[in-house]
Amino acid sequence: MKKVFRKIHLWLSVPFGLLITLICFSGAMLVFETEVMELCHRDLYYVEKVGPAPLPMGKVAEKVAATLPDSVFVTGVTASSAPERAWQVNLSKPRRASVYVDQYTGEIKGKYERAPFFTTMFRLHRWLLDSMKPDGGIFWGKMIVGTATLMFVFVLISGIVIWWPRTKKALKNSLKIVSGKGWRRFCYDLHVAGGMYTLVLLLVMALTGLSWSFSWYRTGFYKVFGVETTQGGGGHGASAQTAAQGGERAQGRSGGRPGGEHRERNSFSPFTSWQKVYEELKELNPDYKQITVFKGSATVSFNRLGNQRAADRYTFNPRSGEITGATLYKDADASGKIRGWIFSVHVGSWGGLTTRILSFLAALVGASLPLTGYYLWIRRL
């Protein structure tokens, strides 16, 4: 039996090994993207001095709106519970566009721009730097990443069978990484012991990652949890920022900035009631992580373990600011919840900093497994 699995392990690893290394390494580089960006651009994400009270949220939105061209609108404002963090004002375009504003002075600190390094790592991780074909042709990069990830699952499972020790002594020895007995021994120990230590996390990351590659897999994966897949965005699995940006089409149609033709037709500012909504949601949710308010809707997210994209959603009257409805995360549809859980488990954020560090290390070890495997295989030829 082990002989068969050894052949499966080898002949799946040889053609897909380098792809697995690229996928794992690029994934590891993305784990702490936010922390790296905030460390390198602290002046963008944090205010210089915390004032006695922030400006009204509507005032902040109007200050940004006054600087925008007629084709771009303010879609929402995200306020963190940390008073030293700058507010994020989301824009209608381009996709995911936003600027950071000092909520105490109204100073526009700068525009959010994803660093080229992380953009490259993301595209490498998801699509091997390929792009979706405008004519709807085969998305080869996405397909290759998905296929390599699926093969990685079989490689990991076959690796368990090959490794499985017969005695306790063999088990103890196989879980040691010795560094003083030559390069070959080190590579062997790293491949065997490293693979076993990270096995569960690598399997979890691979199995959740496949849901973004193949629709048939996503459908089956959801059904395992008794959930039917739904079309559309992240629902309650989406972050507050994503949810806010989801309202950009409605915001754009209604003229999400004062001035221009909309102002001439209707003197009502879409930002008038935002401060009232913000204050009420803060009072209702004292343990909030961030609150995002946009036209007629708002989301509240929390700093809790588990689904890091969990959020309560509210609707309100844009003129009066009266809360007209609420859909709490605990009452949300299961498909929205599982989307957020898949993301949180895949990136390791579900358990806070500890699980993120473990996922980062596991991904790095996963990137090394094909390389050490190639080395050991070539030495045997």
Where are these regions (language model features)?
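Conserved histidines in hydrophobic membrane contexts and catalytic metal-binding motifs
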Residues: M1-L381
